[in-house]
Amino acid sequence: MTESPSPSAEAAAASRAPVGLFEAFLFWLKLGFISFGGPAGQIAIMHQELVERRRWISEKRFLHALNYCMVLPGPEAQQLATYIGWLMHRTWGGVIAGGLFVLPSLFVLIGLSWLYVAFGEVPVVAGLFYGIKPAVTAIVVHAAHRIGSRALKNGWLWAIAAASFVAIFALNLPFPLIVLAAAVIGYIGGRLLPGKFALGGGHGAAKTSYGPALIDDDTPTPEHARFRWPHLLRLCVIGAALWLLPMGLLAAAFGWQGTLTQMGWFFTKAALLTFGGAYAVLPYVYQGAVGHYGWLSPTQMIDGLALGETTPGPLIMVVAFVGFVGGYVHPMFGADHPFLAGAVAASLVTWFTFLPSFLFILAGGPLVESTHNELKFTAPLTGITAAVVGVILNLALFFGYHVLWPQGFSGAFDWPSALIAVAAAVALFRFKRGVIQVLFACALAGLAVHLLRG
């Protein structure tokens, strides 16, 4: 039952001074270092800090902002931080909030990626990753189940998921084509069968009041958050310049076929396809980074996902690992500077991956608000989310194949890896253990197996 705040509480909120930009900066910096647990955990942390504890924003406005971010491609937790920062402190507030959500993870991943590339063959490190690989397979299966249980609400959506699995597994169709087809089916389904394609997985109305907030239910929309065509045009021009300038410099310095140039182009496309979160776009990253460009091996891709799971920030930051390894093994600054090449590649990949996400919030936030909950906009997302389930299942099979048959089907079946994968699945599904706990336990199990084998 919702409790109404007392008049004294309302008066206290009204007299409270606004949060300064520096105070907000310190909070967003802290959040960047503690944002473990994937999007659900990160959103829970923000809710606890911003809604319940600090009262910077009300429950209703928080969920309203989260629903906007759910409609956009990109990591919803990072976009939510950007949105709230923008709502509180204009454009710079959004840039600071979203940037600090990502930067700690980038620095940590650059360091871990270097340790992985430089010392990955050391027995202890190799043993830890031997146990982590089957755990990642179980984690991806769990992600498919989690998203599917929320998204596949009827037979039509199940059919889309099955078709997307066949399309990528049997027909090897490109991931962007699958997303486009699912969006078209969702749009048509929304017109013909609106009840079957209503947006699912969103967040409902607020049911709890934690007292008055600085940005409360009835607080008017700030002037800077109101939609204006000139403002939208200006931000689109700035965004285009922020993309074209580094791409132009890369093309001029390394040529269009250069590693860094191709990374910038590839991850720009990947950023526009992240409906459903990082697990949804990983098959596309695999198709390009592993299959087409050869920036890293299938085994390295699995290890990179494990590193992404154990660091703060969005899981899509696994792209920084892909960039680092690709730059490290294709050193464009000479054979004596592989770390510099890897660090630059990881930073550029992060820039091109997250630039669209910032623009969607800063330029499109007011526009998205004006179209929120209209079926013609949300039905395509429903179709895409259903397709994502089939794509993630394919990713799980891909990981499982490389983990359980490391030498291919003609080689031996890896029974210890299979047992570790089953144990990880039981821990996730039956005992509801966290991802980091599962990875840690499986890493120790893998180390034990590796040492026993000698």
For each feature predicted by the language model, list its residue ranges.
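Multi-pass membrane proteins that catalyze or facilitate reactions on polyprenyl-/lipid-phosphate substrates
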Residues: 1-72, 83-311, 315-454
